[in-house]
From Swiss-Prot:
Enzyme Commission code(s) on record: 1.8.4.12
UniProt source species: Methanosarcina mazei (strain ATCC BAA-159 / DSM 3647 / Goe1 / Go1 / JCM 11833 / OCM 88)
Cofactor: record remark: Binds 1 zinc ion per subunit. The zinc ion is important for the structural integrity of the protein.
Keyword Zinc on entry: yes
Gene Ontology CC, one term: cytoplasm
Name of the protein: Peptide methionine sulfoxide reductase MsrB
Needed co-factor(s): Zn(2+)
Name of encoding gene: msrB
Active site: 121 (nucleophile)
Amino acid sequence: MAQNKIEKSEEDWKSVLTPEQYHVLRQKGTERPFSGNLYYNKEKGIYTCAACGQELFSSDTKFESGTGWPSFYDVISSDRVRLHEDNSYFMKRIEVVCSRCGSHLGHVFEDGPEPTGQRYCINSVSLGFTKEEDTGKEKE
């Protein structure tokens, strides 16, 4: 279940996010491909919203798409994100935003692997990461 909704003023967001995070998360920017640390992350764990900490993606659904952004074929739960039509830059895309704080995460495309066929293409700067051993959910 999604966590309680968070609402902050843009000034409050500016005070808690880095300039790059603010640009991507709050102004719907896009980081340069292959520039984010989490693109290269191979550790087991949970990817969270960098703005509010809501759990979004499991490392079990991360895959190498070759696009330069972390890619996942599914979300932890469908109530963790909201999808919006995005027709900016003369393209038809589906924007992915955090359902808890409304921050821009990236886009979802229909060219991903099985079992969903989806590719959640997410800005690395939009994400936090908690290693599996830190979550207390280690597999036996």
